[in-house]
Amino acid sequence: MKIVALQASPRKGGNCDVLMDEMIRGIEENGGEVVKYYLEKEDIAPCKACMYCAENPECVRADDGNKILDELVAADGVIFATPIYYGQMTAQGKLIIDRFYSIGQNPDKSLSGKAALIFTENQPEGTYEEYINLTKFSPFTFMGYEVIGHVDAGSAGPAGIVAEEQPKKLEEAYELGLKF
């Protein structure tokens, strides 16, 4: 089993990263293999709506986005982790998700398998429940993933504080990793 982990937080070692590492631990303990991408470090250009992908096997952008999309197509599932900034996912996360369009345009490619989502925000848990539910269904379910669950850690401020103040969230992430 191969899982692609997309870390959309620009903060390595931050709360999303800590939770993702716990989820990865659960997957690896079950014999799974995980390829983790820090989207902040990848060269991913935005979709320019040129429709090149409707006529060709991949996006016109010659960047790391195509490599990641190919990994997603070949994988058995995905973990997507993002902090909530001003009520939405980070720009780093949105860049790769917008590029899902090129897969949807190609009849030889599809996204499938299991998906697990991680959200952190510096607001009380539940503040962004509507947004989280919307994100679970669009684009992940829309593109063909079975969303098996999510971890939402509210009141997650300084980097790594979730490990100290919300150890149950680490357990949730680990347990969700075992479900892959």
What are these model-predicted stretches?
Residues 1, 24, 29, 139-180:
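Glycine-rich phosphate/pyrophosphate-binding loop and the adjoining helix
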Residues 1-32:
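N-terminal beta1-alpha1 ligand-phosphate binding loop
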Residues 34-35, 115, 147-148:
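Hydrophobic anchor at the start of a short beta-strand
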Residues 42-69:
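Cysteine-cluster motifs in flexible loop/terminal segments that predominantly coordinate metals
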Residues 51-55, 98, 166-168:
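Short, hinge-like loop/turn segments at secondary-structure boundaries
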Residues 60-143:
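Helix-loop-strand module that forms the ligand-binding subsite of alpha/beta enzymes
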